[in-house]
């Protein structure tokens, strides 16, 4: 019988191996101890309000310049205008209380301007080298406008065809998903996060999001612990070992506990068993949605439970901003939890080299959607094609055929050729059949 006690013994035995890998992981920066010392000095200077500000992510649609200037925002989501990003970073480093740069985040799922096949198509190539190269293209293009963090790859295992986000996944197999996820992480983060064309990756959605009951998005998932460890956690563990910079908790609940308040997943497994020290971010307003789950009474309760469980940064909702100071002052939340979360966030910013180079020089990057990038995208698309059945030997087509009719309402729609989850492409760059 599989039980937590047995697992605890197992992980204690292999813990030195995991710790060694963490120490020599491919993106572990030189001078890690020096970075920790810098974080110590910075934390000692910061007020509680300053620290809470680092834990808050706001939407770029709000363009909250005053909040950035006041040090009340640690990250901006969905900002893509390079001039506005530059203005935000200048405010953060030149006018905020401690000059801490911003994490600029964007969903760069299968390309930024140059669009590659959807993740399910990427998995169908079985070509990790090509996937890594494509992810590097996406990172370079995104970094050229000032983005330094993306919410991908998604590594949710789904075996229910009714689930609506399968296109964003690498499919139903945990081994293939692990291989593809690691390839994308290496492409996005390069071998050194301080490189100008590297951005932080994000392993999402932790964990079991694709196993929702009835294939319904956001639905709760019931997963026996053995299945959780042998299937659903595998890609995340591989990503942690590969040095992924961040991880996103899911909207859903696992075995009755929402992911954004699940200390067994976020503290026991992620932090203690795996010894991972990256940033854990909530999904969009998922901390406040703990109320909708029926798990929390109000925003104050949600902020308390989320931080205790291990959420470092709150995406878009404002429960941390509104209630954490009160919770710490009343003794309901230990200040050490706040310091730990902020340490993780500051470490990522140091690892990205943002304190040294917060403002991007677009001239150092290749042209977006250049010929080489397009050739790579086309090569990936060709390799992603899967033939399930060749009825009556229809393929290969005769060389004597001169014209082929492509029929359907979307056959000549340039946007629909791009697949789901694309935001920043130029439609004129899209080529229909």
Protein language model features and the residues they cover:
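Bacterial Sec-dependent N-terminal signal peptides
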Residues: 1-32
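Glycoside hydrolase catalytic-domain context in secreted enzymes
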Residues: 26-433
